[in-house]
């Protein structure tokens, strides 16, 4: 970068910087500001009586196969209530295909190739679409945190940046509100994979080519946004993760 030294760039998370390099030969085109991943949010208040009655533990939620199995048990135990939902279906496909050995999108020489592996797609189908069709999973509101607020789900996968929207109460159809405890778990992976994966997403900024004065001013602003004090303040208010390693 013409406006950032190597030492300055080394202070930023290297994987965030790599994401902003659109090809191996390119410079830094997208400057990282804030990043997020995904987590599993669990209504612990609703989980405890179910877990005690059915002999399940949070270890069973470590894999997608386990989530589907637990959801089936919850459906039977609760007389037909939904257990789980997730935001961002695309993340399930992209991360899942990568975990299972053949990423859906692969880059080669600066170009992206689209790959569909039938066996991998079938495994992802069996662990999401099938339990969804059976009523074990559901999506009713705009976001799954909305569905937890209404008691329609007791678990969901959503962005870590959405943690501030995680409900602390459940409201029933009659308007009665019940306080709940929510616990956050690692996002599930597929059973038996060699390496667990999680999505990396978030905000970055680009500087439009103009003249040196404007470009340098924009770089100064980006430098300010990623200083530890400012970056931590933004992270706390937004729920995103800071990009500077000293602020993480």
Which residues does each PLM region occupy?
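Paired acidic/hydrophobic, glycine-rich loop segments that form the ligand-binding mouth/hinge
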Residues: 154-159, 166
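Short helices/loops that flank or line small-molecule/ion binding pockets
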Residues: 68-73, 131, 142-156, 171
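Short helix-loop capping/hinge motifs at secondary-structure junctions, enriched
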Residues: 46-57, 211-218
């Amino acid at each position: 970068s013409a406006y950032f030294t190597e030492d300055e760039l080394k202070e930023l998370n290297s994987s965030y910087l790599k994401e902003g390099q659109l090809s191996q030969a390119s410079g830094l085109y997208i400057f990282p500001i804030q990043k997020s991943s995904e987590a599993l949010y669990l209504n612990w208040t609703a989980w405890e009586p179910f877990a005690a009655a059915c002999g399940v533990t949070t270890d069973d939620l470590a894999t997608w196969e386990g989530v589907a199995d637990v959801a089936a048990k919850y459906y039977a135990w609760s007389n037909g209530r939904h257990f789980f939902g997730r935001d961002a279906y695309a993340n399930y496909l992209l991360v899942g295909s990568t975990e299972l050995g053949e990423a859906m999108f692969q880059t080669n020489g600066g170009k992206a190739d689209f790959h569909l592996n039938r066996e991998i797609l079938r495994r992802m189908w069996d662990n999401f679409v099938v339990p969804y069709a059976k009523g074990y999973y559901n999506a009713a509101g705009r976001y799954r945190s909305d569905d937890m607020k209404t008691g329609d789900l007791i678990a969901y996968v959503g962005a870590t940046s959405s943690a501030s929207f995680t409900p602390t109460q459940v409201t029933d159809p009659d308007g009665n509100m019940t306080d709940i405890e929510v616990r956050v778990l690692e996002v599930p992976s597929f059973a038996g994979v060699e390496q667990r994966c999680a999505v990396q997403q978030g905000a970055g900024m680009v500087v439009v080519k103009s003249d040196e004065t404007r470009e340098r001013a924009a770089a100064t602003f980006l430098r300010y946004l990623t200083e530890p004090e400012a970056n931590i303040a933004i992270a706390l208010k937004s729920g995103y993760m800071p990009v500077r390693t000293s602020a993480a």
